[in-house]
C-alpha cells in the first residue's frame, strides 16, 4: 500500500504510506527474486516516493497530476486504474452510503478526463477489476469496466490493448516468476501464445461482442456464456467452440480439429 483507499474505514485515501526506506527494501527484495513491485496509490506524493524506489505498477492513481503521469511514463511504469471508481454509476452502488453520493459524483466529474490524460502523457495502461462487495457484483463490474473504458479512453482499440498486449508487457516484468515465459502475450505473431477469441462482430466498433456492457448491477454475471464469443483458445487449446453449431467446453488440442475446415474460414490470412 502506497496510500489509503476509497472504501477503507481506517485508511484515508489522501494519505501517503510506508517510508521510503521500507518501500526501497520491498523493491530490492522483489528484484532479488527477479520481479517487480505494484502499489496501491492515489496521489502525487505517494507516486513520487514509489518511483524513486523503482516501483513499476500503480493501481488507481486518480488524483495524480499530468507531470506525475509523465514521470511514470519516463520510468517505464504502468497505471492500472479501476475506471468504474469515477463513473457516475458509482452513485447507484449499494456500497456507497447516501451521504457520500454527492461526493462520489463530484469526484467523477472532476476526474472525468483521467483516462485521456494518461494516454496524452504516454502512460501505458492495463486492465484490472479491483472491487469491493459481493463476488457477483465484482463479476458484473468487470464487464461494465470494459465498456466504461471505451467511454473514458475514447478508443476501443486502446481498451483492447489494455486487456491484452499491454497487460502482457507488465506481466513480462516478473522475469523468472512469469508463468508465460515461452512467448509474448496478447499479440498474434509467430512464437506468441496462441490465445484467441473468435467473435461474431467487430470489437473495434462494438465492445459488447467480448462482453462489455453499460449495465452494471443489473447485468448478467460474467460466468454466463457470452453469445457472441464462438471460440476460446488458450495456449493452442480450444476450450469453447461453437463455430459449426456445437459447443465443446472441454480443452482440446489444436490438432483435434480440422483447422482449415472449422477455423480457417474465420481467421483472415493477414
Give the location of each predicted region:
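Short, glycine/charged-enriched secondary-structure capping and boundary segments
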Residues: 52-54, 72-73, 94-95, 140-143, ...
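Active-site core of metal-dependent hydrolases
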Residues: 3-113, 124-134, 200
Amino acid at each position: 500500500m502506497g496510500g489509503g483507499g476509497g472504501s477503507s474505514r481506517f485508511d484515508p485515501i489522501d494519505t501517503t504510506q510506508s517510508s521510503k526506506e521500507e518501500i526501497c527494501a520491498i523493491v530490492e527484495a522483489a528484484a532479488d527474486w527477479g520481479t517487480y513491485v505494484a502499489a496501491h496509490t492515489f496521489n502525487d506524493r505517494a507516486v513520487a516516493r514509489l518511483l524513486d524506489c523503482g516501483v513499476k505498477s500503480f493501481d488507481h492513481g486518480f488524483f495524480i497530476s499530468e507531470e506525475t503521469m509523465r514521470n511514470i511514463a519516463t520510468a517505464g511504469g504502468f497505471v492500472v486504474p479501476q475506471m468504474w471508481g469515477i463513473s457516475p454509476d458509482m452513485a447507484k452502488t449499494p456500497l456507497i452510503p447516501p451521504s457520500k453520493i454527492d461526493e462520489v459524483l463530484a469526484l467523477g466529474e472532476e476526474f472525468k478526463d483521467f483516462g485521456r490524460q494518461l494516454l496524452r502523457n504516454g502512460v501505458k495502461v492495463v486492465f484490472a477489476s479491483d472491487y469491493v462487495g459481493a463476488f457477483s457484483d465484482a463479476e458484473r463490474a468487470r464487464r461494465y469496466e470494459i465498456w466504461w473504458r471505451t467511454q473514458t479512453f475514447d478508443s476501443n482499440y486502446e481498451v483492447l490493448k489494455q486487456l491484452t498486449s499491454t497487460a502482457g508487457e507488465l506481466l513480462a516484468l516478473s522475469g523468472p516468476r512469469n508463468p508465460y515465459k515461452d512467448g509474448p502475450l496478447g499479440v498474434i505473431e509467430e512464437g506468441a501464445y496462441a490465445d484467441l477469441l473468435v467473435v461474431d462482430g467487430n470489437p473495434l466498433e462494438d465492445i459488447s461482442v467480448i462482453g462489455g456492457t453499460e449495465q452494471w448491477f443489473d447485468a448478467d454475471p460474467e460466468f454466463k456464456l457470452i453469445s457472441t464469443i464462438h471460440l476460446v483458445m488458450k495456449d493452442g487449446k480450444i476450450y469453447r467452440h461453437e463455430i459449426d453449431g456445437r459447443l465443446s467446453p472441454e480443452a482440446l488440442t489444436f490438432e483435434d480439429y480440422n483447422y482449415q475446415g472449422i477455423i480457417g474460414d474465420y481467421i483472415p490470412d493477414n
